[in-house]
Amino acid sequence: MQSPQLRFLPVSGPAARDGGVRRMAFWDWSADPEAQGRHVVICVHGLSRQGRDFDVLAQALTPRSRVLAVDVAGRGYSDWLADPMAYQLGNYVADLAALVLQMRAEVPDAAIDWVGTSMGGLIGMAIAAQPALAPRRLVLNDVGPVIEWPALQRIGDYLGLNPSFASEQDAVAYLASISTGFGPHSPAQWLAFSRPMLRERDGRWWLHYDPAIAQPYKAMTTGMEEVAARQFVQDGERTLWALYDAIGVPTLLLRGADSDLLTRATASEMGQRGPRARCVEFAGVGHAPTLLAPDQVAVVQEFLWAA
């Protein structure tokens, strides 16, 4: 099996916790030498995940594409932030904009596409709404301008708990228990999908992210009165719809048929305004499709390679 190269991009903005130059990690799946650089796919994960989530998709794309799977700040091998309240979407967008500009500097004629799961899709919407940064094609995986409040609360129940486990098996079982929305997977798939989420220290297994990523999130979902929090979410939805309506590139929307975060009504509206995303639903899946199943991979592959 092909393995990616772990690379780092120095980024500005919020300081790193260790006081040095902050670095954003990304996994570089290089394409065939003859196709190198001509088609780049940037993949960005969900709120508490990391770039190796895209291993299966990347291996399917690398015959014709170079895939860059990012560890967003505070996740995986990217630096942790000195200020926990800096774990905000705007800072993530700035970091990813730096990567887009770096790729365009390295390969000026490259076609750059974007695949974003959940939070990675929100970052992608903000990038795609800016003509100077917009990808050629955009894939939004189970996310849109309207994010359902119960889903936010569900995620807030486990985000940042920082549990540790006596064995890798126990850690994998825990991750599976909080990820039932991902749909059915074999034990081997759960293990492969979970291993990059873990790190071993002092004989225990820990989640491979900064628990402090939860602080801004919990300030919204548990730190406000419900009325104020809901108003905050509604204001955010207006902003996200404005971003979505500004997108002018072909857009594919993936949705788990049982998703509690992206409703069918929101998906339908996304097909009628802005880039008029084409929606593909996957039965037996909630939030969010993992892009491990062959049918999920094929839909993305066909969309990105269509041009």
Where are these regions (language model features)?
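Active-site loop/oxyanion-hole signature of alpha/beta-hydrolase fold enzymes
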Residues: 19-22, 32-33, 56, 72-115, ...
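Alpha/beta-hydrolase fold catalytic core
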Residues: 1-41, 62-65, 108, 295, ...
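Conserved hydrolase catalytic core segment
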Residues: 109-149
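Conserved serine/cysteine hydrolase catalytic core
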Residues: 200-269
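Catalytic histidine-centered segment of alpha/beta-hydrolase-like enzymes
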Residues: 285-294
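Short beta-to-alpha linker loops that shape the active-site pocket of alpha/beta-hydrolase fold enzymes
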Residues: 71-76, 144, 283-286
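Conserved HGGG/HGGXW glycine-rich cap/lid loop of the alpha/beta-hydrolase fold
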Residues: 28-80
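Conserved alpha/beta-hydrolase catalytic His-Asp/Glu region
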Residues: 166-224
